Amino acid sequence: MTSENPSGAGNQQERPLAAEWVVGFVDGEGCFSVPIFRNATCRLGWQVQPEFAVVQGERSVKVLYALQTFFGCGLVTVNHRHDNHRQDMWRLGVRRLDDLVRHIIPFFEQYPLLTAKAGDFASFAKVVRLMEEGFHLQVEGLGQVASIASTINRRKPSQLLESSEAIRQPPDIDVPGEDMVLASWRHGES
């Protein structure tokens, strides 16, 4: 049912999202991440998977679909892990490199984030650009990507990051220069 008042509470879910609102919402609820994990099928034995994500409880899932429409990309999925309100958690995730390059990065460059998340975005965008050029497929480039990725969403002291299984155990393939990549990743060098 549509209200006579176009800005009334009844029409809040029907209106298209405003860019400024999206920036504020992502500042509070969004995440830019660059996980790097072992994958023997990749040339260097490591896979880099940058992702922009927003997570909400089941009662707010409509906003994720609105963001998906707004950006023109991404996948909304359910995770049956419950939050403290016993709801399923839903997430909008954008992983396709082309979608990140064409939709997500240009938007946040035009409408900058206002919190500390702006720094995470800058590092995230740098990684995506390096990947677009194929740097993550070279030993030195993978080390550079890993170094930049280690600065994103850093809430743990570096010694905890160093103890991660993905960092401790090299892939089960012989890659020339692999030790250099792992060493630069462990120590945050580029």
Please report, for each region that a protein language model flagged, where it lies by residue.
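Sequence-level preference for short, compositionally simple segments enriched
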Residues: 1-190
